[in-house]
């Protein structure tokens, strides 16, 4: 199917060609595996390309999900691997994770911690990043337990009232430059970090932290919801909304956007803070972590992919 979408019970087929510098190879063996996305392969077979192409009959699925084919060709002493995935009624996928009974009660109580946190904003102009239309600042503000959130704020120079965009980060430990392009179009944009450190330092420092104390930070404190790494981050995102609304050029409207880890943070911030009026999410991480317990893949960081943990 051109759109790579199948109905449940329908047989999926993959056309296979092998190219060497754009020239089709013939009579070459292709080893392939079929799996339900990131789960272990349930089929391992080989075909030989007759003429210039072949067909892999990958089968079907009885439940909504994704079927993945991994194809391997050995040619002139080297192995080459390619992947292709099709969906089986993916719009009918439902999460396996269940909402904890005390979820809303817990977060209602936890959010009240921010009432005692002074915003104490700091804004330092980054002159060499400013343009004729946009001012750029390195900013910080208070968060729980005496920590601070840091980010880069870009804001139109022209007087007026503007909507704000909170840009939450993907995974990793890295510097930030700010979004001058969006600000030039008439938005206040705050790009925040989540590690409680300035975001305009030398790149080597972030590499050291990523390989050191912040290695595998997604697991830090995971034994208890009150100590988990992202609890402070979620609250910091809500505090970021406070910061944006405190700006004199704010028109009172705030949107949030992010991808991967940032997609998760965008969803979380929108749920926890009803002041958010627009939400942008692309390939969100942390989705349906418990799916592995039910024989189906979950999203990054795949907490339960290891069967020993399950």
Where are these regions (language model features)?
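Cap/lid segment of the alpha/beta-hydrolase catalytic domain
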Residues: 174-235, 243, 290-300
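Alpha/beta-hydrolase fold nucleophile elbow
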Residues: 249-259
């Amino acid at each position: 199917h051109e759109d790579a979408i199948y109905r449940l019970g329908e047989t999926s087929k993959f056309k296979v060609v092998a190219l060497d510098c754009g020239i089709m190879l013939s009579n070459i063996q292709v080893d392939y595996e079929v799996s339900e996305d990131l789960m272990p392969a349930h089929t391992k077979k080989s075909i030989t390309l007759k003429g210039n192409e072949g067909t892999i009959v990958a089968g079907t699925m009885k439940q909504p999900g994704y079927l993945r084919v991994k194809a391997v060709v050995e040619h002139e002493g080297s192995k080459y691997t390619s992947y292709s995935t099709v969906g089986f009624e993916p719009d009918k996928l439902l999460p396996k994770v269940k909402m904890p009974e005390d979820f809303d009660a817990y977060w209602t109580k936890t959010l009240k911690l921010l009432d005692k946190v002074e915003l104490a904003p700091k804004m330092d102009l980054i002159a060499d990043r400013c343009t004729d239309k946009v001012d750029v600042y390195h900013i910080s503000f208070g968060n729980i337990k005496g920590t601070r959130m840091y980010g880069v704020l870009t804001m139109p120079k022209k007087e007026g009232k503007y909507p704000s965009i909170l840009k939450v980060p993907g995974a990793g430990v890295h510097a930030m430059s700010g979004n001058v392009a969006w600000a030039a179009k008439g938005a206040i944009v705050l790009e925040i970090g989540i590690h409680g450190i300035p975001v305009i330092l030398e790149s080597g420092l972030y590499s050291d932290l990523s390989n050191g104390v912040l290695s595998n930070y997604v697991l830090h404190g995971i034994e208890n919801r009150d100590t988990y790494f992202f609890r402070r981050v979620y609250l910091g995102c809500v505090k970021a909304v406070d910061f944006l609304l405190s700006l004199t050029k704010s028109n009172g409207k705030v949107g949030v956007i992010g991808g991967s880890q940032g997609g998760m943070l965008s969803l979380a911030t929108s749920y926890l803070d009803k002041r958010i009026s627009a939400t942008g999410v692309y390939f969100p991480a942390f989705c349906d972590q418990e799916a592995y317990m039910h024989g189906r893949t979950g999203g990054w960081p795949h907490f339960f992919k290891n069967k020993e943990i399950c």
